[in-house]
Amino acid sequence: MKASIYDFTLKELSQLLKPSFRAKQLYLWLYAKYKTSFKDMQNNFSKDFIAYLEQEFTLRTIEITHVRESVDGSKKYLFKSLRDNHTFEAVLLKMKDKKIDEETNAILEGEKYTVCVSCQIGCQVGCAFCFTQKGGFVRNLKASEIIQQALLIKEDNNLPIEKALNIVFMGMGEPLNNLDEVCKAIEIFNTGMQISPKRITISTSGVADEIPILAGKNLGVQLAISLHAVDDKTRSSLMPLNKKYNIECVLNEVRKWPLEQRKRVMFEYLLIKDLNDSLDCAKKLLKLLNGIKSKVNLILFNPHEGSKFERPSLESARMFADFLNSKGLLCTIRESKALDIEAACGQLREKKLSQQI
């Protein structure tokens, strides 16, 4: 089976292709011009070189099979692997962006885009509140399949080449259980799609053994920890992984995470009605995160088929956030984008091609 050209970093292609400058030319065609056929690259390459590329590599290995758009402008994408027909989802989040013109001080309004990518088909972690785990675990995604999610979404929305994207590994799967492919994808996002590591966030359920390995790679990405509870009993009931890596174990590794000045580790906290949304929980969370340069992102539980949990009121979420902010712990409430198309946090899963998304 031919390798996908999207699986190769710039360094790897430079070592593989002769002369080595061909690698940069090829990257330009792939990531700046969205070319999906080697024959479309004839301006730079000889017929012999194109024949070599066609013999050794393939290009697109996934395709968009369905798109569903939310009233807020967000879109949920169903992708299909062209190799094994398995499906997975990703989401484009569209938000308003305001900037101040340095010369005129005028407020400039625009739009910013975040792509929530998947790194696995299914998930091994088995969080009780997450719809992804109901489909079971199928396999890891390759770097090329991660990259193509963002590439195809950008192409589908006619976003200019120079339009910066934010990338969040918050789709299907646990990034630290597919760390090699995730790290390779991050390198390609940076050198190929020109996405700064500062615009990339890896969200983990807390695979503590892998956190120092990720830190040692010095990728410069943002780290987010899915905490969701303030005691081990509750967290273990929500996240079975906690029985192996409890709260103390995870926080010990987070304390060692290298932070740039002014940067913080994000803690994601899913608020579930009458389970972890009380003021007492907020007080315990404040104590847990003492000494960690952090911020808390509250997420109101997003309902899905078969779930026993309930979404808390916005009022209780605001009380929770107001308490933490009043004590100096930065806390925000995440806006539930794409809730109407079941593309919000915890609502993605593999679907059969006959299913509607």
Curated annotation (Swiss-Prot):
- Disulfide bridges in this chain: C116-C345
* Residue numbers binding [4Fe-4S] cluster: C123, C127, C130
Query: Which keywords belong to this entry?
Result: 4Fe-4S, Cytoplasm, Disulfide bond, Iron, Iron-sulfur, Metal-binding, Methyltransferase, rRNA processing, S-adenosyl-L-methionine, Transferase, tRNA processing
Query: Which residues are responsible for catalysis?
Result: E89, C345
Domain Radical SAM core: where?
109-340
An example GO biological process term is: tRNA methylation
Which NCBIfam families does the record match to this protein?
rRNA_mod_RlmN
Please give the name of this protein.
Answer: Dual-specificity RNA methyltransferase RlmN
